[in-house]
Amino acid sequence: MISSKNDDIAAIATAHGIGSICIIRLSGSTALQSALKLTKISNLSPRLATLTKIYSLDKEFLDEAIMIYFKAPASFTGEDVVEFHTHGGFVVADMILNELVKLGVRLAEPGEFSKRAFLNDKLDLAKAEAIQGLINSRSEAAAKILARQMRGDLSRYVEQMRNELVKTLAFVETSIDYADDDLPDDLLEQIKTMLEANAAKLDKIVQISEQRRGLIDGFKVAIVGKPNVGKSSILNSLLSYERAIISDEAGTTRDRIEENFKVGTHLVRIIDTAGIRKNAGKIEKIGIRYSLAAIEEADIVLAVFDSSSASDEQDERIVELVKNSGKKVFFILNKSDLAFKFDLDLSPSIKISAKKGADEIVGRLRDYLDSQDSSEMMLSSNHQIKQCKDASVAIKRALNLLGDELELFAYEINTAIAAISAITRSFERSEILDEMFSHFCLGK
């Protein structure tokens, strides 16, 4: 559990390992005094890089480093913050950190700097989530979306909607207090229009965020088809190394195989699945269930068929399955270097042989992924999506009560305000904050 104390905390803010620079971050009401005790200087000017020698409490020289002082409240945490920019590697940095601990500075817990920034109104929850997401982002699209959220785009969106709901609640509660006076019809219509618009906005942002979740987490691509149509060969070709066992024996792939690779600027997680067929053994049937589950969770499906064989009932079943999945489907006609016998119309399709044609698949994937607009407002976490869904449901319940049950209407609007506010503002339960910030890295 993250401490709620206002004591001085410190952590190494850069990744452990060999590098040219290592940064130690120190925050708290006496951070400056603690930092100066490891030097022979008497003060630091705010926001000015100062080159100085660092000593242990026993006056042993440790390093020559740059120190920067951020005076409260003009710092990341809102407290006094001092940074030591030491030479890289973790040995020297750990030695300096140990000296700070001897002075009574506490080692920070993961996310504690960001939690202090939040508690000191330097950061809201949406921006905090964006910072952590940006640190962990693995594609340009994700970085751009999260940078906009960190800039405050989502926070402004939430605050505008919250203010409209609060204004509505004020009108209604005034009417409840003066029960003899009914709300004017034109005001009821204005409230109805505003609530319908906000519910529609919430539904839209949830839909966009769920549909384009792959822009942040990476797109899942499932390779499906009958046994022995070349799914594993295609996987190996896309990855440019032998990840899956290839055999002429049908049903070689029984376990689900997952690997990440880049398609242009996008992260893709590709899933090779067991072949789908009727007469499968017990273990293979389990693999087939995994295949069906992979289609369900995938953003994109590569449906692979053997173009050198006539189509059969199993092929028709797979075509129907993927077409009804609601996912983006690319039909791959493999073994196109052999005589063409496949007689199902799968236009448009990609004709390849397992060892040739991966570039065309990658090109089609890249074109499709590039077409996914990342400029629209998006929610970056499951928490944000849930809060928007809850707010939308509460608003719709309120609409059904408008003009009749005003006390219940006010309750539902309060519920909607609480749900939407939780995207940027404090939760009532401190343990939820602890859970969120505990996933941050040290020094953040």
Curated annotation (Swiss-Prot):
Can you say where in the cell this protein is located?
Cytoplasm
List positions binding (6S)-5-formyl-5,6,7,8-tetrahydrofolate.
25, 83, 122, 444
Q: What is its EC number?
A: 3.6.-.-
Q: Which UniProt keywords apply?
A: Cytoplasm, GTP-binding, Hydrolase, Magnesium, Metal-binding, Nucleotide-binding, Potassium, tRNA processing
Q: According to the UniProt record, what class of enzyme is this? A: hydrolase
Binding annotation for Mg(2+): 232, 253
Q: Name one Pfam family in it.
A: MMR_HSR1
A GO MF term: GTPase activity
Keyword Isomerase on entry: no
Classification via PROSITE patterns: G_TRME
One GO cellular component from the entry? cytosol
Instruction: Tell me where in this chain the TrmE-type G domain is found.
Output: 218-370
What is the free-text note on the cofactor?
Binds 1 potassium ion per subunit.
Q: Which cofactors does this gene product need?
A: K(+)
Q: Which residues participate in GTP binding? A: 228-233, 247-253, 272-275
GO biological process assignments: tRNA methylation; tRNA wobble uridine modification
- Spell out the subunit comment: Homodimer. Heterotetramer of two MnmE and two MnmG subunits.
Stated role: Exhibits a very high intrinsic GTPase hydrolysis rate. Involved in the addition of a carboxymethylaminomethyl (cmnm) group at the wobble position (U34) of certain tRNAs, forming tRNA-cmnm(5)s(2)U34.
The record's similarity note reads: Belongs to the TRAFAC class TrmE-Era-EngA-EngB-Septin-like GTPase superfamily. TrmE GTPase family.
Q: What is this protein called?
A: tRNA modification GTPase MnmE
> Organism source for this protein?
Campylobacter curvus (strain 525.92)
